[in-house]
Amino acid sequence: MLSPTFVLWEVGYPLYIYGSIFIVIVIIWQVKRSHHELSSEPKRSCCRCHQKVRQRARDAASTARRRSREEAEKPQKLLSIIKSQGWLPLERSVRRILCADPCCQICNSVALEIQQLLVGENNQISLTLSGPLQGSSCLEMLSTSSMSLDQSLEFHSWHTRELSLSSVTPTLSQLTDQKSLTQSAAQSTYADGIQDYWADHLQLGQEFQVPDVLRGPNTIASSRIEKPRAPLNQEEMTQSNPSLVQGNQGQHHLNSQVSLLSLNPETLNRMHPMALHMVLPAHLPFLSPEVLRLLEVHVKKWMHFQRWGLPRRVEESLRQLMPNPPLYYQPGNDQPVSFNLKNTPQVSLHRFETISLQTWCSCVAGQPIQTFWVSEWSTMNPEQRHHCQQTPNPMALALPSPALKALSGPHPQSGGQDNDSGSDLQQKYSQLFCGLPSLHSESLVATFMGSQGLPKIENVPKPPLKDPFLFNELSFPQLLPKTSPQSAPPSSPLSPNWMSPSDHQRAQINVPFLTLAEYEALEWHLLQRQLQLQWGWPAALQRSQHTQCLMQHEPCGKAQSPETTTASQTGKSISVLTRELLFFPEHARKLLEFHIQKQLIRHRWGLPQKIQQSIQLLLTSTDQQTVSSSSTALANVSIPQPVALEANGACDVLSPIAAPVSIPRPHLLTQVKAILQSHIDSKCGQIHQGKIPACVHRSWDCRISGVLAVAPFPCIPESQFLELQTASDPDLHHKVMPWMPTALDQQQQALPGTVTEHPKLLRVLSVEAIEKLETTLRHKHLAFLSGLPALYYVALPRALAPAVTSQSVITEMEPSPVEIPAEPLIQMVSFEEQCISLGPCPQGNNESCTDVAKEFQPAVPVKGTMETLPLESQTHPTSPHSLQTHILTKLNFHLRKKVLEIQWGIPIRARKSREQTVAAPENISTQKSLESLNHQGETLLQELPIPPDTLPAPNPEGVHLKEQLANDLKAVQQNQKQSNSKAVPQGSAHSVSKISQPSGDMTEAHMPCVQVEANVNKPSLEEPCGPEPQSPSKSKDPAHVPMLAGNREDPEETKAARDHREGDAGFGRSSTREERRPAEDQRPAGMLPNKTPRGSWRWSRSFHLADPCQHSPQHHPQLKLPQLPPRVPGEKESEKDLQDSQTKLTVILEPATIPENAQTVLPQASQGQPFLSQPTQAKPLQGQTLQGQVLHGLVMPVHAQKKPSLTESSFRNKIKCFLQHINPKTKGKGHEDSMFSAAAKVAKTRKENVAKSLAPAKSPVGRSKTEKPTGCSKAQSRPAQKLVGPAFLDGPQSLDDKLRLHSRQPGSASALGYPRHCPRHCPREACANKPGHPT
């Protein structure tokens, strides 16, 4: 048996062990492998990264080499393309396809290539001759091709490094961005330039080429560049060689002590502002698209250079390289062209021997000297301009008019005649002047050219010029001199390279192809441009400015001091612009235009006129200080007057009138500021204290409408109200209440034009308003905790709104409906008054209550609607009964709250918490009210509705009548034993005496809560009792609150009953309101008899509503009868009547009328109802009948007065109501004794009567308890109409079932835990809630 097991164990155990060990080993190995991989991964990734970096570097290097080769091949491609076309032009046609710039390397290279192709020679130029040969080559080519040499040098960003042409063209090593410095620089190098930094110009046409980024001197001296050249005149070569050798001897810095006649810089000097003479044929069929593209880029950049000149950074670098820049001058007629150097004793003249400075100065007397730097150029005066127009210029291209020929500027003495042969080119080609036709250029030059001279002695310190011009147009003296001579930068303020300190703060516009220096130049150019376009400059103004400028210049040889130069700047003008900046963005132009306008206003116009006037008003003449507008020091700030605008033709002229302006001293501004601050502080302090000036208070009154008037501001003293009424007094605006300090009055007098204004402050609320607000918040909080609908607590603030009405408004009111906005805090008519008109209708007027209900329905759920109410419902605060009005307001609010509770429902928890909270204090107030009720008559109740804690005691006469009624009821009870037909009326009479004794005095106080609990068809709505009825048209129960039967017959009796009801439960009626009711009371009296033909059972039902709260606490649990029929068979009309009058206070009877009515009712009840004997035959019915009579005895007399007979249904309803109160009476007997122990002797007598009447009812109660299950089931299964009508006459058995049903019902109601009492008016609950009194 065990052998297989052991075998398996012996075999499996080792396998298990070894297998586990193997698995563990595998796991360990896997973990180690993973760890190793993780540790080695960074090393491998690092190696890969290094490899990628190295590979990327190699790729970048190869890419750079490839690109450099491509760039170097571009000129070769250009040449190859030209060669492939098979084009062999004539010598004079070579430059037709190229620009006229003699120093453009690309064009020169192309021209040389073409020249060599034509000649077939390949010559290499040595290093010493490369520079001059280049210049000579350019000059020769231009002379043979009739092209002008008055062009500037510019280089392009797309220039190649190491431009290697064919054997004819030497390598142009690193040609990009080279600048023209001096002819000796031609020996040097075209050093490295910034690849993407497009070339800038020769400073007004000097052909000295220097790279943007310069190499060291050694590199410059040792660099070799082979320059192309054409066959040159040997004479020119020999004349230029000495200067080149001189420039190369031991010069680490490139100096300019050489003659530039071969390059004719003077010619370029004066021509640069107007001369970019590009002669292009109309059609270039031999050029390929690529060549055309390159040429187009070249031309565009050259034009841009011509417009904007050399960037500031390039000029600064050149200044470092050339410490002694040359000077140029415009020669007179037939005078030699010289190149003058500052601080240099010798001047080398081309083709002439060296002469001294004095000799040169004598030769050039009266001629302007031009500086080397573009930023320091000056313009010509009118005379010199006229003189220059008469000077022939053979080297320049013949232009359509002598004006443009004069613009060609200085000219050389040699080779001039050779260029005359090229004048025929002007007939074939158009000359482009900065992209404009020649005619346009001519007109601009002839019209606007003007200039200004400069000192001509080299030792004279040359102040920076204040009125330079833009490169593509002439200019007048500058408009905005922004720097002083002492602090001027090397470049002129208005030069393209100059930027004022304020300009650095301007918004930088992102123009992709412009550098910072270019943008700065553009910005200033646009400043000039905007002025010229917007305002223009008439010829008369220009001539006057030119004359002024001419008078400011001195002849040659006389030094001009810096002061004189500074004084000469007073004549200010702007430059004339000639073309639009098509490449400039529109948004940039707009921004610049705005900036220009702002700058003009700030620099030329000063502060706005209004500000100046306001400052002057604050100061006297002695406190003003006149400051010269010409001063720019910070201590002497000047504010020039606005520039006058004069219209001359179609142009607006800016006449800069620099008149002295008065400006306040700083300490005066400080004083004014301190005065204003102190004034504001004092005002704020007074306002915080609640003291408002009369003018401010009056403005508040004006802003508040009369309908919504508010109580006077409490902080204004009564003695000052007279000032508030003097609105017509003009001085009242500036008056201040006596509590204001005197200094403030003086301050206001010092500033008569000012009116003190204060921000709106929250008005101080009265104590009553604060209390109402607090109450509103509490109600909202309770509504939130109890889960009430929003409409409930939304309506509460309206109910809390005070009836604040000024007496003036009250006197103006007319007896007509008034629309009142439903605002939460301020209302003319309080919401409580609206509740009165919508509340109980004691007259029994179904239609009137229904109409009012219809008006009220939209007002409750809809917030902010207009509610139209009759004027009768408004509360008059001027009523003499102030206490009555206050009480009435509270009761109306409570009534309104109860209406809302009935309509929308209150949760059970809210009711329980309310009962527990109010039970103890209300018990005390109720007991006090019971004592007071015994000593006061019914007349006071009719005059004014009084709250429960101040209800007066009933009249002793009424007590006597009640006792008499009790005796009569006892007699009736004895007669009932003898005859069953008379038993019920007698028992009812006896019941009246029994119940009226303990609680007859409390009828007025507890009637409202009975009315509230009368809804039969809504057993779930179990709200606490309150001093108000249900709101009309909200409950659909036809038998909710029936009307009194007495209101249906006699109008006189109706009025009497209405008076009783107003005294009992109409708490919302004030004395003033009762005086206005006669007209309204007459209407329901005539209508009720037709509306309620059958009202006996409704009368008994309404009496049941009035009864429970009037009597002992035993009645309250049976206030609500879920099993009451909604309709009675055979009484459809009465059902409709019940629907119309379900929320009215129908049963409100005075104690004085009870005995009289009881005496008249009893015989009618016994005579007119023969069928009543059947229900009363049963033994247990006797006690119950007595209970029913007790319930209905109080109200039955009134019904008997109105209607002589009782119907069958009314009697059965009385029995039903009696059965509802049997069980609580027996249980709460002890409570009844304790509650009425504090009453007067009359109350004790009533207790004895009640005890006697309750004795026969004990046995029925016990029997009803034993039959609870069957009675309850029958009560639940029976229809509601069986309780009333002919079906109730079946026999004693059915009556017994009914009795059992009613005896069972109180227990079920109490089991449900729904309270049936009003803590405010029903003393039962207050006593029951005390310790030792279980509920």
From Swiss-Prot:
Keyword Transmembrane: yes
Positions of region (Disordered): 403-424, 480-502, 972-1002, 1019-1141, 1248-1335
Compartments, as annotated in UniProt: Membrane
GO CC, alphabetical: membrane; nucleus
Compositional bias segments (type: Polar residues): 414-424, 972-1000
Name of one Pfam family that matches: DUF4599
Comp. bias regions, Basic and acidic residues: 1047-1064, 1071-1083, 1129-1139
Membrane topology note: Single-pass membrane protein
Residues spanning the membrane: 8-28
InterPro entries: SPATA31, SPATA31F3-like
Keywords for this protein: Membrane, Transmembrane, Transmembrane helix
PANTHER family found in the cross-reference section: ACROSOME-SPECIFIC PROTEIN, PROTEIN SPATA31F1-RELATED
Family stated for the protein in its record: Belongs to the SPATA31 family.
Name of the molecule in the record: Protein SPATA31F1
Lineage: Eukaryota, Metazoa, Chordata, Craniata, Vertebrata
Gene this protein is translated from: SPATA31F1
